[in-house]
Amino acid sequence: MVRSSCLQCDQPSQGSNSTFGCGGPLAAVCATGLLVLVLYSPSSQTANWSAQGISTKALYPAVPVPSTLLPGSAPAKHQLHVWRAHAMSEATTNNSFKQSLFGYNAISSIWLQLAGVAATFFAFGALMAAVTQRKEIAVFSASGQAAEPEGAEPLKRPFPSPAAKPKPLFSTPANSFSNIFQAPPSLRTDSTYGRGPRSTSFTDISNWPSNNALRNPQSVIDIGGGVDFLGDRSPGNPFTRLRGSPSSTLSNLGMGLGLGLGKGKGFGKGFGKGRGFPVEEEVEEEQEVLSWADRRRALADPDAPPMNEDIKYPQLRLVRAVPGGRDEKLGVMSRQEALELAEAEDIDLVLVSIDTDPPVAKLVNYSKLKYESEKKKKDSHKKGKVKEVKELKVSHKIGQHDYDVRVKQARKFLEGGHRIKVSMEFKGRENQFVEIGRAVMKRFQNDLADMGKADAVPKKLGTRLILNLAPAGEALKVIAERRAERDRKAAAEEEGEGDDLDFVDENEDEDVEGEGEEEEAEELEEETAEGTEVPTRS
Protein backbone atom coordinates (compact mmCIF):
# COMPACT_ATOMS: atom_id res chain seq x y z
CA MET A 1 0.00 0.00 0.00
CA VAL A 2 1.24 3.45 -0.91
CA ARG A 3 0.35 6.58 0.99
CA SER A 4 1.24 10.10 -0.15
CA SER A 5 1.75 13.41 1.57
CA CYS A 6 2.92 16.87 0.59
CA LEU A 7 6.43 18.13 1.26
CA GLN A 8 5.23 21.75 1.62
CA CYS A 9 2.40 21.50 4.15
CA ASP A 10 3.29 18.46 6.30
CA GLN A 11 -0.24 17.01 5.71
CA PRO A 12 -1.11 13.66 4.14
CA SER A 13 -3.04 13.51 0.90
CA GLN A 14 -6.85 13.45 1.31
CA GLY A 15 -8.38 10.53 -0.51
CA SER A 16 -7.15 8.59 -3.47
CA ASN A 17 -7.96 11.40 -5.93
CA SER A 18 -5.83 13.99 -4.13
CA THR A 19 -2.61 12.90 -5.68
CA PHE A 20 -0.59 16.07 -5.69
CA GLY A 21 -1.32 17.49 -2.24
CA CYS A 22 -0.38 21.14 -2.48
CA GLY A 23 -0.08 20.70 -6.23
CA GLY A 24 -3.84 21.45 -6.61
CA PRO A 25 -3.33 25.21 -7.05
CA LEU A 26 -0.60 24.48 -9.54
CA ALA A 27 -3.00 22.32 -11.52
CA ALA A 28 -5.52 25.20 -11.47
CA VAL A 29 -2.90 27.58 -12.85
CA CYS A 30 -2.09 25.07 -15.57
CA ALA A 31 -5.77 24.75 -16.50
CA THR A 32 -6.14 28.55 -16.62
CA GLY A 33 -3.22 28.83 -19.01
CA LEU A 34 -4.68 26.19 -21.28
CA LEU A 35 -8.06 28.01 -21.24
CA VAL A 36 -6.34 31.26 -22.27
CA LEU A 37 -4.70 29.47 -25.17
CA VAL A 38 -8.04 28.06 -26.34
CA LEU A 39 -10.01 31.33 -26.01
CA TYR A 40 -7.42 33.55 -27.66
CA SER A 41 -6.16 31.24 -30.37
CA PRO A 42 -6.15 32.66 -33.95
CA SER A 43 -9.09 30.52 -35.10
CA SER A 44 -11.28 31.44 -32.12
CA GLN A 45 -10.47 35.15 -32.57
CA THR A 46 -11.46 35.03 -36.23
CA ALA A 47 -14.75 33.36 -35.32
CA ASN A 48 -15.31 36.09 -32.71
CA TRP A 49 -14.86 38.77 -35.37
CA SER A 50 -17.40 37.08 -37.63
CA ALA A 51 -19.95 36.80 -34.79
CA GLN A 52 -19.65 40.52 -34.06
CA GLY A 53 -19.88 41.50 -37.74
CA ILE A 54 -16.47 43.09 -37.76
CA SER A 55 -14.56 42.83 -40.96
CA THR A 56 -10.81 42.62 -41.17
CA LYS A 57 -10.78 45.73 -43.38
CA ALA A 58 -12.16 47.74 -40.45
CA LEU A 59 -9.19 46.57 -38.40
CA TYR A 60 -6.56 47.24 -41.04
CA PRO A 61 -8.08 49.63 -43.61
CA ALA A 62 -4.75 50.34 -45.28
CA VAL A 63 -4.03 46.68 -46.09
CA PRO A 64 -5.87 44.84 -48.86
CA VAL A 65 -7.08 41.49 -47.57
CA PRO A 66 -7.14 38.49 -49.92
CA SER A 67 -10.50 36.81 -50.20
CA THR A 68 -8.97 33.54 -49.13
CA LEU A 69 -8.08 35.05 -45.73
CA LEU A 70 -11.49 36.61 -44.93
CA PRO A 71 -13.44 35.27 -41.96
CA GLY A 72 -15.35 32.15 -42.80
CA SER A 73 -12.83 30.89 -45.35
CA ALA A 74 -11.06 28.82 -42.68
CA PRO A 75 -7.49 29.67 -43.76
CA ALA A 76 -4.55 27.77 -42.43
CA LYS A 77 -3.19 29.03 -39.13
CA HIS A 78 0.28 29.71 -40.44
CA GLN A 79 -1.13 31.69 -43.40
CA LEU A 80 -3.24 33.83 -41.07
CA HIS A 81 -0.20 34.50 -38.86
CA VAL A 82 1.84 35.54 -41.88
CA TRP A 83 -0.92 37.88 -43.10
CA ARG A 84 -1.40 39.33 -39.61
CA ALA A 85 2.29 40.17 -39.29
CA HIS A 86 2.26 41.73 -42.74
CA ALA A 87 -0.86 43.74 -41.94
CA MET A 88 0.62 45.06 -38.68
CA SER A 89 3.77 46.12 -40.52
CA GLU A 90 1.76 47.97 -43.20
CA ALA A 91 -0.51 49.59 -40.61
CA THR A 92 2.51 50.90 -38.74
CA THR A 93 3.96 52.32 -41.94
CA ASN A 94 0.68 54.13 -42.88
CA ASN A 95 0.24 55.64 -39.38
CA SER A 96 -2.87 53.54 -38.88
CA PHE A 97 -1.36 51.49 -36.06
CA LYS A 98 -3.15 53.59 -33.40
CA GLN A 99 -6.49 52.93 -35.05
CA SER A 100 -5.88 49.20 -35.11
CA LEU A 101 -4.53 49.22 -31.55
CA PHE A 102 -7.13 51.47 -29.86
CA GLY A 103 -10.06 51.00 -32.24
CA TYR A 104 -10.09 47.30 -31.49
CA ASN A 105 -7.93 45.36 -28.98
CA ALA A 106 -6.41 43.10 -31.58
CA ILE A 107 -2.84 43.20 -30.29
CA SER A 108 -4.00 42.36 -26.74
CA SER A 109 -4.96 38.89 -27.87
CA ILE A 110 -1.33 38.22 -28.77
CA TRP A 111 -0.20 39.35 -25.30
CA LEU A 112 -2.76 37.09 -23.70
CA GLN A 113 -1.59 34.20 -25.83
CA LEU A 114 2.04 34.75 -24.78
CA ALA A 115 1.01 35.07 -21.13
CA GLY A 116 -0.97 31.85 -21.40
CA VAL A 117 1.99 30.01 -22.89
CA ALA A 118 4.30 31.28 -20.12
CA ALA A 119 1.80 30.38 -17.39
CA THR A 120 1.34 26.93 -18.87
CA PHE A 121 5.06 26.20 -18.96
CA PHE A 122 5.54 27.54 -15.43
CA ALA A 123 2.65 25.52 -14.07
CA PHE A 124 3.86 22.41 -15.87
CA GLY A 125 7.37 22.78 -14.43
CA ALA A 126 6.07 23.36 -10.92
CA LEU A 127 3.77 20.37 -11.29
CA MET A 128 6.68 18.16 -12.33
CA ALA A 129 8.70 19.40 -9.34
CA ALA A 130 5.83 18.56 -7.02
CA VAL A 131 5.55 15.09 -8.51
CA THR A 132 9.31 14.57 -8.21
CA GLN A 133 9.37 15.69 -4.58
CA ARG A 134 6.33 13.62 -3.68
CA LYS A 135 7.09 11.36 -0.78
CA GLU A 136 6.09 7.72 -1.02
CA ILE A 137 6.59 5.43 1.94
CA ALA A 138 6.67 1.74 1.20
CA VAL A 139 6.80 -0.63 4.14
CA PHE A 140 8.01 -4.07 3.27
CA SER A 141 7.70 -7.25 5.25
CA ALA A 142 10.50 -9.71 5.74
CA SER A 143 9.40 -11.67 2.66
CA GLY A 144 9.55 -8.56 0.46
CA GLN A 145 5.79 -8.09 0.01
CA ALA A 146 4.14 -4.78 0.86
CA ALA A 147 2.12 -4.64 4.05
CA GLU A 148 0.59 -1.67 5.85
CA PRO A 149 1.01 -1.86 9.64
CA GLU A 150 -2.14 -1.33 11.61
CA GLY A 151 -2.57 2.00 13.35
CA ALA A 152 0.12 3.68 11.27
CA GLU A 153 0.37 7.38 11.91
CA PRO A 154 0.33 9.89 9.06
CA LEU A 155 3.72 10.60 7.56
CA LYS A 156 5.76 13.32 9.28
CA ARG A 157 7.84 15.81 7.37
CA PRO A 158 11.59 14.99 7.47
CA PHE A 159 12.44 18.31 9.16
CA PRO A 160 10.60 19.72 12.20
CA SER A 161 10.33 23.15 10.60
CA PRO A 162 11.79 25.03 7.66
CA ALA A 163 14.10 26.89 10.04
CA ALA A 164 15.52 23.63 11.41
CA LYS A 165 16.31 22.22 7.97
CA PRO A 166 20.10 21.86 7.67
CA LYS A 167 22.01 23.05 4.66
CA PRO A 168 22.26 20.26 2.04
CA LEU A 169 25.63 18.60 1.72
CA PHE A 170 25.51 18.84 -2.07
CA SER A 171 23.37 20.76 -4.56
CA THR A 172 21.37 17.68 -5.53
CA PRO A 173 17.64 16.87 -5.31
CA ALA A 174 16.24 16.75 -1.83
CA ASN A 175 15.54 13.04 -2.08
CA SER A 176 19.11 12.03 -2.90
CA PHE A 177 21.86 13.13 -0.54
CA SER A 178 20.63 15.96 1.68
CA ASN A 179 20.52 13.69 4.76
CA ILE A 180 23.32 11.40 3.80
CA PHE A 181 24.89 10.97 7.24
CA GLN A 182 21.69 10.26 9.18
CA ALA A 183 21.36 6.96 10.99
CA PRO A 184 18.50 4.54 10.18
CA PRO A 185 15.20 5.01 12.05
CA SER A 186 15.86 1.93 14.20
CA LEU A 187 18.88 3.60 15.79
CA ARG A 188 17.87 7.26 15.58
CA THR A 189 17.44 8.90 18.99
CA ASP A 190 17.85 12.51 17.93
CA SER A 191 14.95 14.30 16.26
CA THR A 192 17.25 16.67 14.37
CA TYR A 193 18.15 15.46 10.90
CA GLY A 194 21.41 16.02 9.13
CA ARG A 195 23.76 14.45 11.70
CA GLY A 196 24.22 11.13 13.39
CA PRO A 197 22.56 10.15 16.66
CA ARG A 198 24.23 11.26 19.86
CA SER A 199 23.73 7.98 21.69
CA THR A 200 24.90 5.70 18.87
CA SER A 201 28.53 4.68 19.10
CA PHE A 202 30.69 3.06 16.46
CA THR A 203 30.29 -0.28 18.24
CA ASP A 204 26.52 -0.13 17.77
CA ILE A 205 26.93 0.80 14.12
CA SER A 206 29.12 -2.23 13.53
CA ASN A 207 26.27 -4.44 14.76
CA TRP A 208 23.78 -3.19 12.19
CA PRO A 209 22.01 -5.72 9.93
CA SER A 210 24.00 -7.12 7.07
CA ASN A 211 23.84 -5.82 3.55
CA ASN A 212 21.50 -8.58 2.38
CA ALA A 213 18.85 -7.53 4.87
CA LEU A 214 18.84 -4.00 3.45
CA ARG A 215 18.32 -4.85 -0.22
CA ASN A 216 14.63 -4.05 0.25
CA PRO A 217 14.52 -0.32 0.96
CA GLN A 218 12.92 0.86 4.16
CA SER A 219 12.35 4.25 2.56
CA VAL A 220 12.76 5.64 -0.92
CA ILE A 221 13.91 9.12 0.07
CA ASP A 222 14.49 8.66 3.78
CA ILE A 223 17.87 9.31 5.27
CA GLY A 224 20.44 8.83 2.56
CA GLY A 225 18.07 6.90 0.29
CA GLY A 226 17.05 7.64 -3.25
CA VAL A 227 18.89 7.19 -6.54
CA ASP A 228 22.65 7.48 -6.83
CA PHE A 229 24.62 8.86 -9.78
CA LEU A 230 24.58 5.51 -11.57
CA GLY A 231 20.80 5.25 -11.42
CA ASP A 232 20.82 2.54 -8.74
CA ARG A 233 18.32 2.73 -5.93
CA SER A 234 20.01 3.20 -2.58
CA PRO A 235 18.56 1.84 0.66
CA GLY A 236 17.43 3.98 3.53
CA ASN A 237 20.52 3.04 5.55
CA PRO A 238 23.23 5.47 4.41
CA PHE A 239 25.99 3.33 5.88
CA THR A 240 25.24 0.31 3.66
CA ARG A 241 24.94 0.27 -0.12
CA LEU A 242 23.23 -2.19 -2.46
CA ARG A 243 26.57 -3.41 -3.84
CA GLY A 244 29.34 -4.94 -1.79
CA SER A 245 29.42 -5.89 1.85
CA PRO A 246 30.52 -3.97 4.93
CA SER A 247 34.15 -4.54 5.83
CA SER A 248 34.37 -2.88 9.23
CA THR A 249 33.05 -0.02 11.33
CA LEU A 250 31.55 2.75 9.17
CA SER A 251 32.17 0.52 6.16
CA ASN A 252 30.08 2.36 3.55
CA LEU A 253 29.14 5.92 4.38
CA GLY A 254 26.59 6.39 1.61
CA MET A 255 28.86 8.21 -0.79
CA GLY A 256 31.82 5.89 -0.36
CA LEU A 257 33.94 8.52 1.37
CA GLY A 258 35.96 9.02 -1.80
CA LEU A 259 37.72 12.04 -0.29
CA GLY A 260 40.66 9.89 0.75
CA LEU A 261 39.15 8.34 3.87
CA GLY A 262 39.44 4.57 3.93
CA LYS A 263 39.77 3.19 0.42
CA GLY A 264 37.16 5.25 -1.43
CA LYS A 265 37.70 5.76 -5.15
CA GLY A 266 36.34 9.29 -5.28
CA PHE A 267 33.30 10.88 -6.87
CA GLY A 268 33.82 9.47 -10.36
CA LYS A 269 31.50 6.47 -9.95
CA GLY A 270 28.39 7.22 -7.98
CA PHE A 271 30.36 8.70 -5.09
CA GLY A 272 32.94 5.92 -5.28
CA LYS A 273 33.02 2.50 -3.69
CA GLY A 274 33.61 3.15 -0.05
CA ARG A 275 35.36 0.43 1.87
CA GLY A 276 35.37 2.22 5.17
CA PHE A 277 37.92 2.35 7.94
CA PRO A 278 39.59 -1.04 8.40
CA VAL A 279 40.18 -1.67 12.05
CA GLU A 280 43.78 -2.67 12.64
CA GLU A 281 44.87 -4.09 15.92
CA GLU A 282 47.97 -2.54 17.39
CA VAL A 283 50.61 -5.16 18.05
CA GLU A 284 53.41 -4.21 20.37
CA GLU A 285 56.71 -5.42 18.99
CA GLU A 286 59.30 -6.61 21.42
CA GLN A 287 62.40 -4.47 21.05
CA GLU A 288 65.82 -5.64 22.01
CA VAL A 289 67.08 -3.74 25.03
CA LEU A 290 70.73 -2.77 24.58
CA SER A 291 73.06 -1.87 27.37
CA TRP A 292 74.46 1.63 27.68
CA ALA A 293 77.87 0.55 26.47
CA ASP A 294 76.44 -1.24 23.42
CA ARG A 295 74.32 1.76 22.48
CA ARG A 296 77.27 4.11 22.87
CA ARG A 297 79.48 1.86 20.76
CA ALA A 298 76.82 1.53 18.05
CA LEU A 299 76.31 5.28 17.87
CA ALA A 300 80.04 6.01 17.88
CA ASP A 301 80.90 3.47 15.15
CA PRO A 302 77.99 2.08 13.12
CA ASP A 303 80.47 0.12 10.93
CA ALA A 304 82.05 -1.66 13.87
CA PRO A 305 82.64 -5.43 13.47
CA PRO A 306 80.69 -7.90 15.62
CA MET A 307 82.04 -7.98 19.14
CA ASN A 308 81.25 -9.42 22.57
CA GLU A 309 77.62 -10.62 22.75
CA ASP A 310 77.05 -9.85 19.06
CA ILE A 311 79.23 -12.80 18.10
CA LYS A 312 76.93 -15.80 17.52
CA TYR A 313 79.43 -18.51 16.53
CA PRO A 314 79.58 -21.37 19.07
CA GLN A 315 83.33 -22.04 18.59
CA LEU A 316 86.08 -19.41 18.16
CA ARG A 317 89.81 -19.48 17.47
CA LEU A 318 91.05 -16.97 20.03
CA VAL A 319 94.14 -14.74 19.85
CA ARG A 320 95.34 -11.98 22.17
CA ALA A 321 96.90 -8.71 21.04
CA VAL A 322 100.44 -8.26 22.38
CA PRO A 323 102.41 -4.95 22.24
CA GLY A 324 105.01 -5.20 19.52
CA GLY A 325 102.81 -6.37 16.68
CA ARG A 326 102.69 -10.13 17.33
CA ASP A 327 99.50 -11.87 18.53
CA GLU A 328 99.42 -14.64 21.11
CA LYS A 329 97.45 -17.70 20.04
CA LEU A 330 95.15 -19.07 22.74
CA GLY A 331 93.62 -21.92 20.75
CA VAL A 332 90.02 -22.95 20.04
CA MET A 333 87.44 -22.45 22.76
CA SER A 334 83.70 -21.98 23.10
CA ARG A 335 81.96 -18.65 22.76
CA GLN A 336 81.04 -18.56 26.44
CA GLU A 337 84.61 -19.21 27.57
CA ALA A 338 85.92 -16.45 25.28
CA LEU A 339 83.38 -13.98 26.66
CA GLU A 340 84.29 -14.84 30.24
CA LEU A 341 88.00 -14.38 29.46
CA ALA A 342 87.36 -10.99 27.83
CA GLU A 343 85.29 -9.87 30.81
CA ALA A 344 87.99 -10.97 33.24
CA GLU A 345 90.67 -8.97 31.39
CA ASP A 346 88.29 -5.99 30.85
CA ILE A 347 88.84 -5.91 27.11
CA ASP A 348 86.70 -6.57 24.05
CA LEU A 349 86.21 -9.77 22.12
CA VAL A 350 86.29 -8.69 18.46
CA LEU A 351 85.50 -10.94 15.50
CA VAL A 352 88.45 -10.55 13.13
CA SER A 353 87.88 -13.10 10.36
CA ILE A 354 85.10 -15.50 9.37
CA ASP A 355 86.99 -17.13 6.48
CA THR A 356 88.44 -19.85 8.70
CA ASP A 357 86.73 -22.65 10.57
CA PRO A 358 86.18 -21.79 13.36
CA PRO A 359 86.21 -17.97 12.94
CA VAL A 360 89.04 -15.95 14.48
CA ALA A 361 88.32 -13.63 17.41
CA LYS A 362 90.77 -11.30 19.08
CA LEU A 363 91.06 -10.06 22.65
CA VAL A 364 91.87 -6.39 22.23
CA ASN A 365 90.85 -2.92 23.28
CA TYR A 366 88.61 -2.02 20.36
CA SER A 367 89.07 1.73 20.79
CA LYS A 368 92.84 1.35 20.54
CA LEU A 369 92.51 -1.01 17.60
CA LYS A 370 90.31 1.47 15.77
CA TYR A 371 92.76 4.29 16.45
CA GLU A 372 95.71 2.29 15.13
CA SER A 373 93.87 1.32 11.96
CA GLU A 374 92.92 4.94 11.27
CA LYS A 375 96.49 6.02 11.91
CA LYS A 376 97.83 3.50 9.43
CA LYS A 377 95.41 4.80 6.83
CA LYS A 378 96.61 8.34 7.41
CA ASP A 379 100.26 7.34 7.16
CA SER A 380 99.72 5.49 3.92
CA HIS A 381 97.80 8.46 2.57
CA LYS A 382 100.61 10.83 3.49
CA LYS A 383 103.24 8.66 1.87
CA GLY A 384 101.28 8.48 -1.33
CA LYS A 385 100.40 12.17 -1.30
CA VAL A 386 102.31 14.35 -3.76
CA LYS A 387 103.24 17.80 -2.60
CA GLU A 388 101.46 20.46 -4.57
CA VAL A 389 103.15 23.34 -6.33
CA LYS A 390 101.91 26.60 -4.86
CA GLU A 391 101.70 29.54 -7.24
CA LEU A 392 102.08 33.16 -6.18
CA LYS A 393 101.17 35.95 -8.58
CA VAL A 394 103.03 39.23 -8.32
CA SER A 395 103.22 42.36 -10.45
CA HIS A 396 106.14 44.43 -11.66
CA LYS A 397 104.47 47.43 -9.92
CA ILE A 398 103.60 45.64 -6.65
CA GLY A 399 103.49 47.71 -3.48
CA GLN A 400 105.59 47.11 -0.38
CA HIS A 401 102.76 45.76 1.77
CA ASP A 402 101.64 43.28 -0.85
CA TYR A 403 105.22 42.24 -1.40
CA ASP A 404 105.66 41.44 2.30
CA VAL A 405 102.44 39.37 2.29
CA ARG A 406 103.72 37.34 -0.67
CA VAL A 407 107.03 36.67 1.07
CA LYS A 408 105.24 35.51 4.21
CA GLN A 409 103.06 33.15 2.22
CA ALA A 410 106.09 31.76 0.40
CA ARG A 411 107.87 31.01 3.70
CA LYS A 412 104.88 29.03 5.02
CA PHE A 413 104.61 27.05 1.82
CA LEU A 414 108.30 26.20 1.86
CA GLU A 415 108.16 25.14 5.54
CA GLY A 416 105.30 22.82 4.62
CA GLY A 417 107.47 21.13 2.01
CA HIS A 418 105.78 22.66 -1.05
CA ARG A 419 107.46 24.00 -4.14
CA ILE A 420 106.66 27.57 -5.20
CA LYS A 421 106.09 29.07 -8.63
CA VAL A 422 106.22 32.86 -8.72
CA SER A 423 104.57 34.25 -11.85
CA MET A 424 104.40 37.77 -13.27
CA GLU A 425 102.21 38.57 -16.30
CA PHE A 426 102.77 41.34 -18.85
CA LYS A 427 99.95 42.55 -21.11
CA GLY A 428 100.24 44.81 -24.12
CA ARG A 429 102.53 47.75 -23.53
CA GLU A 430 103.56 46.28 -20.15
CA ASN A 431 106.10 44.15 -22.05
CA GLN A 432 108.44 47.15 -22.01
CA PHE A 433 108.76 46.68 -18.22
CA VAL A 434 110.07 43.09 -18.35
CA GLU A 435 113.43 44.14 -16.91
CA ILE A 436 111.66 45.80 -13.97
CA GLY A 437 109.86 42.50 -13.43
CA ARG A 438 113.15 40.58 -13.47
CA ALA A 439 114.45 42.91 -10.75
CA VAL A 440 111.37 42.20 -8.60
CA MET A 441 111.89 38.45 -9.11
CA LYS A 442 115.57 38.73 -8.11
CA ARG A 443 114.61 40.60 -4.97
CA PHE A 444 112.01 37.94 -4.15
CA GLN A 445 114.62 35.20 -4.58
CA ASN A 446 117.13 36.94 -2.32
CA ASP A 447 114.57 37.45 0.47
CA LEU A 448 113.81 33.70 0.45
CA ALA A 449 117.37 32.49 0.07
CA ASP A 450 117.39 30.97 3.59
CA MET A 451 114.19 28.98 2.95
CA GLY A 452 114.22 28.08 -0.74
CA LYS A 453 116.49 27.54 -3.68
CA ALA A 454 115.75 28.66 -7.24
CA ASP A 455 115.99 26.02 -9.94
CA ALA A 456 117.08 28.61 -12.52
CA VAL A 457 116.94 32.27 -13.31
CA PRO A 458 113.49 33.74 -14.08
CA LYS A 459 112.31 32.72 -17.56
CA LYS A 460 109.94 34.49 -19.93
CA LEU A 461 107.30 32.03 -21.15
CA GLY A 462 104.82 33.72 -23.42
CA THR A 463 103.41 36.69 -21.59
CA ARG A 464 104.53 35.50 -18.15
CA LEU A 465 107.80 35.62 -16.23
CA ILE A 466 108.30 32.46 -14.10
CA LEU A 467 110.52 31.76 -11.04
CA ASN A 468 110.54 28.28 -9.39
CA LEU A 469 111.65 27.79 -5.75
CA ALA A 470 112.17 24.52 -3.83
CA PRO A 471 112.47 24.05 -0.04
CA ALA A 472 116.06 24.43 1.20
CA GLY A 473 118.10 25.62 4.17
CA GLU A 474 115.92 26.60 7.11
CA ALA A 475 112.84 25.14 5.49
CA LEU A 476 114.39 21.69 5.47
CA LYS A 477 115.33 22.04 9.13
CA VAL A 478 111.78 22.99 10.05
CA ILE A 479 110.47 20.04 8.08
CA ALA A 480 112.88 17.66 9.86
CA GLU A 481 111.92 19.00 13.29
CA ARG A 482 108.23 18.53 12.61
CA ARG A 483 108.82 15.02 11.37
CA ALA A 484 110.83 14.15 14.50
CA GLU A 485 108.07 15.58 16.70
CA ARG A 486 105.48 13.43 14.98
CA ASP A 487 107.60 10.30 15.36
CA ARG A 488 108.17 11.00 19.04
CA LYS A 489 104.46 11.36 19.74
CA ALA A 490 103.67 8.24 17.74
CA ALA A 491 106.20 6.22 19.75
CA ALA A 492 104.77 7.55 23.01
CA GLU A 493 101.28 6.53 21.97
CA GLU A 494 102.44 3.04 21.03
CA GLU A 495 104.01 2.59 24.47
CA GLY A 496 100.61 3.17 26.03
CA GLU A 497 101.05 6.65 27.42
CA GLY A 498 97.47 7.49 26.41
CA ASP A 499 95.17 5.01 28.20
CA ASP A 500 91.87 6.68 27.38
CA LEU A 501 91.95 6.65 23.60
CA ASP A 502 88.18 7.02 23.23
CA PHE A 503 88.53 10.77 23.48
CA VAL A 504 91.52 11.37 21.19
CA ASP A 505 91.36 14.82 19.67
CA GLU A 506 91.67 14.31 15.93
CA ASN A 507 92.14 18.03 15.35
CA GLU A 508 95.24 17.95 17.54
CA ASP A 509 96.78 15.32 15.31
CA GLU A 510 96.08 17.44 12.28
CA ASP A 511 97.77 20.45 13.88
CA VAL A 512 100.83 18.38 14.69
CA GLU A 513 101.17 17.40 11.07
CA GLY A 514 101.32 21.06 10.10
CA GLU A 515 98.13 20.96 8.07
CA GLY A 516 96.66 23.83 10.10
CA GLU A 517 99.47 26.11 9.02
CA GLU A 518 99.01 25.09 5.42
CA GLU A 519 95.33 25.96 5.57
CA GLU A 520 96.17 29.35 7.06
CA ALA A 521 98.64 29.99 4.28
CA GLU A 522 96.08 29.03 1.68
CA GLU A 523 93.61 31.47 3.19
CA LEU A 524 96.17 34.25 3.02
CA GLU A 525 96.86 33.32 -0.57
CA GLU A 526 93.19 33.58 -1.50
CA GLU A 527 92.82 36.92 0.23
CA THR A 528 95.74 38.57 -1.53
CA ALA A 529 96.18 36.41 -4.63
CA GLU A 530 95.98 39.30 -7.06
CA GLY A 531 97.78 41.86 -4.94
CA THR A 532 97.41 45.62 -4.90
CA GLU A 533 98.96 47.25 -7.91
CA VAL A 534 100.79 50.53 -7.26
CA PRO A 535 101.39 52.69 -10.31
CA THR A 536 105.07 53.25 -11.01
CA ARG A 537 106.63 56.61 -11.49
CA SER A 538 107.48 57.41 -15.07
Curated annotation (Swiss-Prot):
Q: Where is the composition biased (Acidic residues)?
A: 493-530
Which GO terms of type biological process are on file?
ribosome disassembly
**Keyword field:** Chloroplast, Initiation factor, Plastid, Protein biosynthesis, Transit peptide
Q: Which InterPro entries match?
A: T_IF-3_C_sf, T_IF-3_N_sf, Translation_initiation_fac3_CS, Translation_initiation_fac_3, Translation_initiation_fac_3_C, Translation_initiation_fac_3_N
Q: Does the keyword Plastid apply?
A: yes
This protein's transit peptide sits at 1-140
Superkingdom of the organism of origin: Eukaryota
Task: Give the location in the cell.
Answer: Plastid, Chloroplast
- State the residue spans of region: Head: 141-290
Region called Disordered, residue ranges: 146-165, 188-210, 484-538
**An example molecular function term from Gene Ontology annotations:** ribosome binding
- Pfam families cross-referenced by the UniProt entry: IF3_C (PF00707), IF3_N (PF05198)
| Residue ranges of the region described as IF-3 like | 291-474
One cellular-component annotation, GO: chloroplast
Reproduce the UniProt comment on modification after translation: The N-terminus is blocked.
**What Gene3D superfamilies does the annotation carry?**
Translation initiation factor 3 (IF-3), C-terminal domain, Translation initiation factor 3 (IF-3), N-terminal domain
Predominant localisation class: plastid
UniProt xrefs under SUPFAM superfamilies: Translation initiation factor IF3, C-terminal domain, Translation initiation factor IF3, N-terminal domain
Q: Which family does it belong to?
A: Belongs to the IF-3 family.
Assembly and interactions? Monomer.
Please give the function described in this protein's UniProt entry.
Involved in chloroplast protein synthesis. It enhances the poly(A,U,G)-dependent binding of the initiator tRNA to chloroplast 30S subunits.
Protein name (record): Translation initiation factor IF-3, chloroplastic
Source species, please?
Answer: Euglena gracilis
